């Protein structure tokens, strides 16, 4: 399973792969890349992927997560609700509070994400993300730049 990718001179090691996504880790940046490899991830598989990140944080220092959704073509509200209301809350306790997202270049997908967040905040609370920083970026390199700037300040 030794497959590595390099962004901005940082080597990311493949640490988990399933039929739906790949997880890569870089210890210097304390960052995990979660890359959706397919157009749709069923909710049970979606939960397994993110539960794997929860397990990884027990073994590795992870302060930054980038979820690259560019390959997704299906928006699934129940997955997003679980991700926001359950998973992000549990992972916040473990110190993973910096989340980066790359959305598909599809206007309807962006609108669905915004509408989905609105519904989640209405159902749970608008301060659901207190203590969690979410940044939307266009590239993995942009997220790395942001991490480097924040660690040098």
Predicted regions mapped to residue ranges:
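Amphipathic, Lys/Arg-enriched alpha-helical "gate/interface" segment within cytosolic domains
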Residues: 2-153
